[in-house]
Amino acid sequence: MMERQITKYSLAVLAIVFTSCYYDVAEVLYPPTNCVTDNMSYATDIAPILQINCYVCHNEAANNGNVTLEGHANVINYVNSGQLMGAIKHQSGFSAMPQNSTPLGSCEISKIEQWIVQGAQNN
């Protein structure tokens, strides 16, 4: 008789523990994305992304793979050929970039993509 009560209490405690420790809140599980891609500016939005993720290997001095992404005049060549988007989106036929590092986030890719759609201006 005593064993049954202990078992009942144990099951009740376990049920409370497992059901009370978790809750579904959409904002916690799926945080809103605050990726603003309106009116992209090369100087304000794109150059900083390239500087953080690309300049280590693709600057005027290093020029790895004969690719220089320092400055709009250099970047626009890779934009026009499709190489920039192909590389950062890891598309077939392109070297996935950045190599040996974390891929660009979806927001960073969206910003670059929208900047290109908006004319890839040197602004």
Please provide the spans of the model-predicted regions.
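Sec-dependent bacterial lipoprotein signal peptides
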Residues: 1-21
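Aromatic- and Gly/Pro-enriched helix-to-coil junctions and flexible linker segments
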Residues: 21-123
